[in-house]
Amino acid sequence: MKKSWRNNVEFYLIGLLLLMVIAFSIAMPNIFWSVSNFQSIASQMPVLGILALAMAMTMLCGGINLSIIATANACSLVMAWVATSYPPGGATALATLLAGGGAAMIIGLCNGILIAGIRVSPILATLGMMTLLKGINILITGGSAIANYPQWVLWLNHAQWFGIPLPMWLFAVVAAGLWVLLEKSPLGRAIMLIGSNERATHYSGFNTRRVLMWVYVISALLCAVAAFLMMSKLNSAKASYGESYLLVSILAAVLGGVNPDGGSGRIVGMVLALFLLQIIESGFNILGISPYLTMALWGVLLLCFIQARGMLGLERAG
């Protein structure tokens, strides 16, 4: 059935986005509309955006992945070790990316086995994985950072195409790929059905355990992509980087229309939510407002949006 504007999540997000743009345009027209400000937003959004997509993948099937930050840090440490241990070159670059992807697949498979195979609660399984990975990351590095990467790692963060940072293009490609996966593929349909009712989906002939395994592997691989972007941006890798992204990624997913109980959500809504959060953060930074107040505003925004979902029936908007 066609959705009306009243239960269309994207409609409200566009309204909030326009409201924020108008407010910041009035408060600081010259700075807010500067090219450097929008390039700054475009450079900051990809890491958070890809991590939020990694979180959303698991929430769509009724789960959650609390280990996304620990997974990203583990992958970045593995890639950092390979990139700094061997001479720069095509073989080293390929080995670095394969090592990060391999580490992500192992972590994703472990989460998938715990959740789909052993039937551990997603929140407990990924919380345990997060704690395990953080401990291993700190143990291996001693809490210190691995830095001073070769130029080919740093190139990604500085490269632009049509004036837009290359990481933003990479985020767009990842988001478009996930949209195709969720909207046009049998796997995407199965993910949504599992989120709505896993038992009924199983009895309908779907291999729900295999689907859940794929979900957590894809989530981990997205973390590896975010990890490489963090490496390129920060020129270092550390066990404790990006910890504030965990709650913000959940916020972006829910604000973007992903049902925390699973079964509904759209990539378009998530992208709009990410733009909204980044514009708020950028505007507050320019105004010199404390980042803690920004975080508090995000919390208020989430609570208000949850209330709106209940009042306007947005929870039924898939």
Q: What is each residue range found by the language model?
A:
Residues P87-M129, V173, L272-A273:
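Alpha-helical transmembrane segments within multi-pass membrane transporters and channels
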Residues L13-S25, M55, G101-A104, M130-G135, ...:
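Hydrophobic core segments of alpha-helical transmembrane domains in multi-pass membrane transport
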Residues M1-A23, A176, S196, H202-R210, ...:
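Cytosolic-side transmembrane-helix boundaries in multi-pass membrane proteins
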Residues C223, K233-G299:
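Transmembrane alpha-helical segments in multi-pass inner-membrane proteins
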Residues I118, P122-S185, V211-W214, K233-G242, ...:
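Transmembrane helix-bundle core of multi-pass membrane transporters
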Residues I22-M28, W33-P87, I113-R119, V254-I267, ...:
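Single transmembrane alpha-helix segments in multi-pass membrane proteins
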